[in-house]
């Protein structure tokens, strides 16, 4: 309340926040008077939402889990499901058993893209029951990818353009046998201009941009032409590039040519990570919610929400650095480690008057603070949440648009812990006082009341409390369910974009950040990445073996990495060289260690997502190899101490 303006505050949300907590949180921020609601989606799938909203009128995927069992083609792009979405491996295995052909487009030969060994005995039924001990004993998995395309980072648009160029050539030879002309004529706009654009794209631009051969592209096109029901999956390997939105719209162009949306076994599938990052957006966690939502929110609670756009994550960091935002509130998450340009972001956080975090465990964001810092411990979702009206449950929305209940069963770690909804409601009541029109105590006492308000404000939640007690349910998705595209013109759009060649100067490499297998987002559980053969360390740079030799380096050598962005340089020291099956001129490092190399000013067009997957770097032998060895020893010692704690 001491701030000069409500816009001097920012309310950040982690994707682990429940629907009920998120709804209360955005209501608190807007009754306070600001739309400064940055969230973790700004760093990951913001590009997906921007791309899909323009193309098909909804920022979510358009497939169900059941669709995977009916797809005959699945294209996995910029995603490593074995490490980042392990539960998806069962879905892909079932799809393979149902006859699907899988094409993987990824710079790295990830084991999780190649095969799956399912450790769950319940997945083996009937005649397959005896396969379980045999597969476990001899380590025999189910092959996944039928074709792997080792493109360069950000080569996806060029690869897709090449696939469609091959398909167009066949369609012109045999009209009506490759493209779904009836669907295109009935449900889309801009097809003729887009097809002309494909014809005009030279093959040398496609091959240079993708890093693939004509034969590899032809092989993928032949698979696509045989398939009648295609699903395209993608994750941050696509969303964190300068042209990420355009690339995802190229995926939609590919799907639209075959009519692969709005029918069983087909559609776009952006695969999100956190358990409720999609649900938080549905609940209103966004700095620029539409007028329809804001009008209904204001009507439900009898106030006038602020209508000017707020700040996203990158804009919030810059505003803190400039002194425009003086109060930062984090509802979960690890903001410092999730964001780019670590040193810049740290100084921005330290420029605040007050930083506060609601958390279940300590993380690095609690160490880099404003002048005053608060840590508000809260119940984990696995713990019993008992309020005035009795035991409570919350809900989340997954990547398929399914609303699931979540109820804790463990005794709370402390009798003093409060739940996220209770903390938000208590803070809102104390902060807003007589200004509020909300019965915050009543919401905290019984989450059914929160869900009643959600039902009144957000479409698709009719009879929310009754339905969620009966079963999980899908939210409506008109693009998927009715082939209705609410994008302003009522038809799915073919959108034309140019291929970015991303040419490098001699001695430069294109770096992308990735996660290890012992890691979930910013939470690091150990120093091993067994699927890539890395043990006891994370400061690793994966390089093509020929690049290692050509640059005079050796496996295991310590090097310093320098990023280059518009005349700016940033340095990350003491990384160990690790040869890997990755295209020449390309490298990979672990997130968040390499976030220091990502410029705060390098963001995707239209989504403002940090460009963490195409960072231009140079590599030099470490200036202080002895210090690098000492740092490694300290890391190993600290890791051993953590493991040996009782």
Regions found by a protein language model. Give the residues of each.
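Cofactor-pocket helix-loop regions in the catalytic cores of large enzyme subunits
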Residues: 1-272, 298-480, 536-573
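Short, solvent-exposed secondary-structure boundary/capping segments
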Residues: 581-594
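Long, low-complexity segments enriched in small/aliphatic residues
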Residues: 246, 441-530
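Surface-exposed loop and adjacent secondary-structure segments within mature catalytic domains
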Residues: 122, 284-288
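Flexible, small-/acidic-enriched active-site or ligand-binding loops
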Residues: 276, 526-537, 593-605
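Basic-flanked hydrophobic alpha-helices used for secretion and membrane insertion
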Residues: 572-581
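Long, low-complexity intrinsically disordered regions
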Residues: 606-646
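Structured loops at beta-to-helix junctions and adjacent beta-edge loops in soluble globular domains
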Residues: 14, 235-237, 271-273, 378-379, ...
């Amino acid at each position: 309340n001491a701030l000069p303006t409500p816009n001097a505050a920012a309310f950040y949300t982690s994707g682990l926040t429940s629907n009920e907590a998120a709804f209360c949180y955005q209501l608190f921020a807007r009754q306070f008077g600001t739309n400064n609601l940055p969230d973790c989606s700004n760093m990951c799938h913001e590009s997906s939402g921007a791309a899909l909203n323009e193309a098909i009128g909804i920022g979510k995927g358009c497939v169900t889990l059941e669709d995977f069992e009916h797809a005959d083609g699945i294209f996995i792009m910029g995603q490593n499901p074995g490490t980042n979405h392990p539960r998806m491996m069962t879905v892909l295995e079932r799809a393979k058993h149902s006859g699907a052909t899988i094409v993987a487009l990824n710079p790295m030969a990830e084991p999780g893209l190649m095969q799956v060994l399912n450790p769950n005995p319940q997945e083996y039924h009937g005649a397959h029951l005896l396969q379980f001990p045999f597969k476990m004993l001899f380590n025999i998995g189910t092959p996944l990818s039928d074709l792997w395309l080792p493109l360069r980072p950000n080569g996806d648009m060029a690869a897709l353009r090449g696939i469609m160029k091959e398909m167009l050539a066949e369609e012109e030879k045999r009209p009506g046998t490759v493209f779904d002309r009836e669907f295109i004529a009935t449900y889309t706009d801009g097809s003729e201009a887009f097809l002309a654009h494909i014809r005009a794209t030279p093959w040398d631009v496609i091959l240079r941009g993708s890093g693939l051969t004509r034969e590899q592209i032809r092989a993928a096109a032949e698979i696509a032409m045989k398939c009648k029901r295609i699903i395209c999956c993608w994750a941050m390997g696509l969303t964190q590039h300068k042209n990420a939105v355009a690339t995802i719209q190229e995926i939609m162009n590919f799907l639209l040519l075959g009519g692969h949306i709005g029918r069983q076994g087909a559609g776009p599938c952006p695969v999100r990570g956190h358990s409720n990052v999609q649900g938080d957006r549905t609940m209103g966690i966004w700095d620029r919610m539409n007028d329809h939502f804001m009008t209904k929110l204001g009507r439900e609670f009898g106030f006038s929400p602020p209508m000017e756009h707020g700040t996203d994550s990158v804009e919030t960091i810059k505003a803190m650095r400039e002194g425009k935002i003086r109060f930062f509130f984090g509802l979960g998450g690890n903001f410092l480690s999730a964001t780019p340009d670590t040193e810049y972001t740290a100084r921005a956080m330290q420029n605040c008057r007050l930083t506060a975090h609601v958390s279940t465990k300590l993380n690095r964001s609690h160490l880099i603070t404003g002048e005053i810092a608060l840590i508000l411990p809260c119940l984990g979702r696995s713990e019993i949440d008992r309020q005035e009206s009795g035991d409570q449950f919350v809900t989340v929305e997954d990547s398929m648009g399914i609303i699931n209940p979540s109820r804790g069963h463990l005794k709370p770690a402390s009798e003093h812990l409060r739940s996220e909804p209770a903390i938000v409601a208590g803070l809102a009541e104390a902060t807003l006082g007589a200004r509020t029109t909300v019965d915050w105590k009543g919401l905290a006492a019984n989450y059914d009341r929160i869900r009643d308000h959600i039902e009144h404000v957000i479409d698709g939640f009719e009879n929310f409390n009754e339905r969620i007690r009966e079963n999980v349910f899908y939210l409506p998705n008109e693009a998927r369910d009715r082939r209705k595209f609410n994008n302003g013109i009522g038809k799915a759009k073919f959108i034309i974009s140019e291929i970015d060649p991303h040419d490098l100067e001699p001695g430069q490499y294109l770096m992308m950040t990735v996660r290890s297998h012992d890691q979930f987002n910013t939470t690091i559980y150990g120093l091993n990445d067994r699927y890539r053969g890395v043990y006891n360390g994370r400061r690793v740079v994966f390089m093509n073996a020929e690049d290692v030799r050509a640059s005079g380096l050796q496996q295991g050598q310590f090097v310093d990495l320098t990023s280059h962005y518009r005349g700016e340089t940033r340095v990350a020291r003491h990384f160990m060289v690790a040869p890997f099956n990755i295209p020449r001129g390309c490298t990979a490092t672990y997130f968040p260690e390499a976030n220091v190399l990502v410029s705060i000013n390098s963001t995707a067009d239209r989504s403002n997502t940090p460009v963490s997957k195409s960072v231009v770097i140079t590599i030099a032998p470490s200036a202080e190899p002895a210090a690098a060895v000492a740092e490694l020893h300290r890391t190993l010692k600290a890791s051993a101490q953590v493991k040996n704690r009782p």
